[in-house]
Amino acid sequence: QVYNYVGPLYGQPLKVGQRAVLLISTYSDGSHTATVYEYDRAVGLAVIVGLFLLATVLVGGKVGAKSLVALAVTLVCLFWILIPLLMKGASTLLTVFLVCAYITVVTMVILGGVCRKTVCAALGTVAGTALALLFGLLSQSLLRIDGLRLTDVEPLLQLRQTGTPLGLRGLLVAGVVISALGAVMDVAMSISSALTEVHTVAPDRDGRALFRSGMNIGRDMVGTMTNTLILAFLGSGLSFIIYLYSLGLDPRQLISSPYMATEVISGIASSIGVILAVPLTALITSLKIGRASCRERV
């Protein structure tokens, strides 16, 4: 027998020929029942991912192909290294930071080759990520918010009751670090690459002039990147924000809710990482970039 319970918030109305995922239960008498779990979205997801891969390679060429390799490495690190370590009880923040640093180094080497430009970008990224982590911890302590107040933490609490030694209190800041990593890498690599070009065109420029150029370039990037991060965090929680707004809460109640405090910490801590990556990368690059040329494999 196959059951499909359909309601406004659950169940899937199916038509003849549509594929679905079933949950099959086997009883002691050998009988079976099946319940419709969800649409089978595997084919649709494969098409969407295929279009993404195709667009990346067609537009980006060799660099696009390299970026896909870097993305694959990132996913492997997150799903086969980070999550298993956290499930075994490893220190949440230290593990996340070290994995992000590893992802940064591997990604930079894949995209930029082995050179001082890449090293400077990687150092700027790691430094910016570390400051985002520290700012997140400070903000979390100041606002008295911890990982136990996250909206989706209840299933993890149930998981801990089964004996899984998962540390929950650092998940908020850990999520901030992971979310900000891509933007921080983007800013750091852009500044390092730009200063490399400036040095190539004007090799007589000293470190101070290169640093000023890096700051000028970085200021133009900070505004859009900060906007991107803030909007990304707010957009991901838009439905819950609408729900809070519909309650007609007093503004002080609204801004004091754990959810709003969590979103503020997430958005601002990520932006801090991007902002501070600008002077850090500009400083590191201006001190180091003039001494070596890249050994890139194109």
Name each region found by the language model:
Residues 173, 273-277:
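Hydrophobic alpha-helical transmembrane segments of polytopic membrane proteins
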